[in-house]
Amino acid sequence: MRQEVFVLDPRDNVATLVSENGKKGAKFRLVVDGAQQEFTLASDIPFGHKFAIRPIFKGAQVTKYGFSIGTATAEIRPGEHVHIHNIESNRGRGDLAGQGKEA
């Protein structure tokens, strides 16, 4: 069976979906904190995007690759999509670049 979800570092609080099966309600199993856990996607998640594997509280760091990639702007529950609607990047907003807005 091919792996559809990756957690890149044990400190991460997100997983990366590498499957076209990112529909709301899809279930994935992976080892988190040494235990096999099942996650149900709370919404459709595109290939290559992230979802939470632990609760992430507003203001908490979002961790991928073992490093902070941003700060949660809202509470994020396990299985929820983690993207620009609920995280402020540590590196700026590439989607705003070139629009006369602060990146």
Residue ranges with predicted function:
Residues 2-103:
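N-terminal small-residue-enriched
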